[in-house]
Amino acid sequence: MLAARRLLGWSLPARVSVRFSGDTTAPKKTSFGSLKDEDRIFTNLYGRHDWRLKGALSRGDWYKTKEILLKGPDWILGEIKTSGLRGRGGAGFPTGLKWSFMNKPSDGRPKYLVVNADEGEPGTCKDREIIRHDPHKLVEGCLVGGRAMGARAAYIYIRGEFYNEASNLQVAIREAYEAGLIGKNACGSGYDFDVFVVRGAGAYICGEETALIESIEGKQGKPRLKPPFPADVGVFGCPTTVANVETVAVSPTICRRGGTWFAGFGRERNSGTKLFNISGHVNYPCTVEEEMSVPLKELIEKHAGGVTGGWDNLLAVIPGGSSTPLIPKSVCETVLMDFDALVQAQTGLGTAAVIVMDRSTDIVKAIARLIEFYKHESCGQCTPCREGVDWMNKVMARFVRGDAQPAEIDSLWEISKQIEGHTICALGDGAAWPVQGLIRHFRPELEERMQRFAQQHQAQQAAS
């Protein structure tokens, strides 16, 4: 009978199937988003509450931190690995694995945690909200993360333009010292840990981890060749882990609530909650914490009030900050906001800074402006980046006017491919990908613009 039913395509009801197979595991989650308030880690993103120590304590920061520290590095690393947390700065490397690289037998050199708060990517402003309105989350995260990797101090490298944020952070650090939460015998755990703030001077390239280390050491912010990696030779020649602000700030909550709790959000390999910036042509630009793998359309419509002029007025979206390729409206309809789904869509999650562009946007001019930014911020160390991005910038300026030949589109694509993957750091990639996204999805717009320019030029010549 069962064989006949199989031939007919008939399947057992779910409960009966479970009883026959003995499989009692819960069904896989298939819908994502609508994060509940009680599951939010960042509860003061908009600065409606007191950001100082008293307010932070009332919101659950520094709760049972001593117990977390006393459980030791292996336990903390275990929870972080269980959580499935991946780096929130753009690369998406598994955090537990990265932090565990520091747990080698000591050779006598001190270990350091460096927090990358040099948030200079156009469209990205999530970390500054944490530092400005929830600085104690970051300070506590430094302590917990430092304990996990056996570090003795944390250096928070903050963007030079973040004046108010640096001030708030310094106040939070002073309060933590005065309360005995950091410093000698931090939280009464017997563990000594210091936190220092280093202010940058406006160079976007210092967001790259080795350029950041060079800057802390007082040198020019130019990326280093790897290997050696920072976990072996980092700041002051000592083992160092460089981590993003959001990555560090969520670690105490993961340890308090458990890695399994955090892993319950989002798809497999894309777990947890995430801060998203939504800017551009939306009714209510915002920074919001939402579940990973939330549909992009739902994210924009629920939290940002939708696209100006309605969803049908959408032209394209840059989903992860200026260095990720844009995606057109047709892709935005169904794509999920996580690492794997966006890679499949030929883009990336990056910093999760969603830049929305409606049909009023000159898409060619918008991308050309981003290329000008990368040309300006290139440190000039690598020839493909120094020469290639400058060349792309000049070509894109002509593309904006339409003063080019269709064959130059393929030439521009080729030069972007010669830059991508051929530089010491990822700035070259960040300049190449927006161009590739434009050509991939808006080639007809480029060709039409060139055709219009040629017709106008011919008409002017005929008139003269």
From Swiss-Prot:
It is found in: Mitochondrion inner membrane. GO terms for biological process: mitochondrial electron transport, NADH to ubiquinone. Pfam families: Complex1_51K (PF01512), NADH_4Fe-4S (PF10589), SLBB_2 (PF22461). One of its GO terms (molecular function) is NAD binding. The modification N6-succinyllysine is found at K81. Belongs to the complex I 51 kDa subunit family. [4Fe-4S] cluster binds at C379, C382, C385, C425. The keyword Cell cycle does not apply. This is NADH dehydrogenase [ubiquinone] flavoprotein 1, mitochondrial. The lineage of its organism: Eukaryota, Metazoa, Chordata, Craniata, Vertebrata.
